[in-house]
């Protein structure tokens, strides 16, 4: 597949950022998120038929992006230091590309990291020559009329909720909807600062190195997509619920996460040395509605904290229901009382260091789950219809990103593992029973 970039420009906010908003203070949760860019890729079939319509589409995207940056001004700024963003209206990157001889279905039917990476403004392990907090790339597939829009967000100031709300606002401006009525909350709370709730802290070089290592990429990582059908998930949820003596009924994310974690355990049990006694599962939890008073849902930043479940790796048959319920308990304990204690008197760092020690415990394997489900990404209609497929791409070791399938019932899991483990993971009985690989979506 050959994709050629035809233009690149910097999009500035349509209105200058007021002086009193020139500095956006980071929270400690922003500080620990790392400075990598994470992508969301939206695929639209049959959007453009000629150069005139391509130009109109690009102009619309750029104009509405400029308007959106006025509300989300930190995304047009630059990281000033470890405590703040300079909202200097430098702008965001916008790249236009053409795939003259390729059909978009080639990617959607059997996506690979290499294919998806070509749709990004920058490669996954590439540092932009000029640091940006947001970069977008639109790729037109001239052979079929399809289009892919990739938006990359800096993890310093965005979690998946922030990213989804940014795209929703961008769509609102592009479609010409009235942003002064139903979207008042977006305008009012888009840059609600959380530094007063989760104050920033000075990090030691050790903590900073640990965070960087946890976000590093590796050529020895293999990333694949596993599709969990909605009907199979529903049956799995019902089975788990019937087996629970406590009345527990799993969510879609908890049920699918249990199958994935069971697959990782299976890999560990097949290892020649079998030296990991536990699997430490980490799942990002949205804090917006878990504190009192709640933080506005539209607020930007990394308003998430990890739920941690330490799961014993045993020779006996894997109990998926128990895995799901243990993960559920680790999520549910993150409430207002827990968060106030965790962050009280600047205690976040000491508590975080206790967690980080688990990363380097030779008896534990760490696996991270990021659930992007129940976000309105499939509602992103800029004026040419809703996306046929929404995806991401990553290479972080021992990570799974979960997204809704297009029907809203299933889940697509992007799983990144060391190459030596992926073949074993694919053959795990739970994965074979509940997931499929390389299934055509459109």
From Swiss-Prot:
Monomer. Belongs to the plant acyltransferase family. It catalyses: (1S)-1-hydroxy-luvungin A + acetyl-CoA = (1S)-1-acetoxy-luvungin A + CoA. The keyword Acyltransferase applies. The keyword Acyltransferase applies. PANTHER family: BAHD ACYLTRANSFERASE (PTHR31623:SF28), F21J9.9 (PTHR31623). Its EC number is 2.1.1.-. Transmembrane segments: none annotated. The gene is L1AT. The active site is at 155 (proton acceptor), 381 (proton acceptor). Acetyltransferase involved in the biosynthesis of limonoids triterpene natural products such as limonin, a compound with insecticidal activity responsible for the bitter taste in citrus. Catalyzes the formation of (1S)-1-acetoxy-luvungin A from (1S)-1-hydroxy-luvungin A. InterPro entries: CAT-like_dom_sf. Signal peptide: none annotated. This is Limonoid 1-O-acetyltransferse. Pfam families: Transferase. Keywords: Acyltransferase, Transferase. GO terms for molecular function: acyltransferase activity; oxidoreductase activity.
């Amino acid at each position: 597949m050959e994709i050629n970039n035809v233009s690149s420009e910097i999009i500035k906010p349509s209105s200058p950022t007021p002086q009193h908003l020139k500095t956006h203070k980071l929270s400690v949760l922003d500080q620990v998120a790392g400075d990598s860019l994470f992508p969301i890729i939206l695929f639209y079939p049959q959007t453009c038929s000629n150069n005139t319509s391509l130009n109109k589409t690009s102009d619309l995207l750029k104009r509405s992006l400029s308007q959106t940056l006025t509300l989300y001004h930190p995304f047009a700024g630059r990281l000033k230091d470890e405590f703040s963003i300079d909202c200097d209206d430098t702008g965001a990157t916008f790249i236009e590309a053409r795939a003259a001889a390729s059909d978009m279905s080639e990617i959607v039917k059997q996506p690979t990291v290499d294919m998806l990476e070509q749709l990004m403004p920058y490669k996954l392990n590439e540092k932009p020559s000029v640091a940006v907090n947001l970069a977008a790339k639109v790729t037109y597939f001239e052979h079929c009329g399809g289009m892919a829009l990739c938006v990359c967000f800096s993890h310093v100031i965005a979690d998946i909720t922030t990213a989804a709300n940014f795209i929703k606002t961008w769509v609102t401006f592009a479609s010409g909807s009235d942003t002064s009525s139903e979207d008042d909350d977006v305008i009012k709370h888009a840059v609600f600062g959380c530094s007063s709730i989760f104050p920033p802290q000075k990090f030691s070089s050790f903590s900073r190195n640990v965070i960087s290592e946890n976000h590093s990429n590796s050529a020895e990582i293999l990333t694949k997509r596993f599709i969990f059908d909605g009907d199979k998930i529903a049956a799995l949820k019902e089975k788990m619920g019937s087996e629970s003596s406590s009345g527990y009924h799993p969510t879609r994310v908890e049920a699918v996460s249990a199958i994935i974690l069971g697959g990782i355990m299976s890999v560990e049990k097949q290892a020649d040395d079998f030296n990991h006694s536990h699997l430490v599962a980490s799942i990002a939890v949205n804090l917006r509605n878990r504190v009192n008073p709640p933080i506005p849902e539209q607020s930007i930043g990394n308003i998430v904290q990890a739920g941690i479940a330490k799961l014993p790796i045993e020779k006996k048959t894997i109990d998926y229901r128990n895995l799901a319920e243990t993960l559920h308990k680790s999520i549910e304990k993150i409430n207002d009382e827990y968060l106030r204690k965790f962050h009280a008197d600047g205690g976040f760092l000491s508590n975080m260091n206790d967690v980080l020690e688990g990363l380097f415990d030779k008896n534990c394997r760490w696996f991270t789950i990021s659930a992007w489900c129940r976000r309105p990404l499939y509602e992103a209609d800029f004026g040419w219809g809703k996306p046929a497929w929404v995806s991401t791409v990553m290479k972080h070791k021992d990570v799974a990103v979960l997204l809704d399938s297009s029907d809203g019932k299933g889940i697509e899991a992007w799983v990144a593992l060391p190459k030596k483990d992926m073949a074993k993971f694919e053959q795990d009985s739970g994965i074979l029973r509940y997931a499929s690989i390389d299934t055509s979506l459109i």
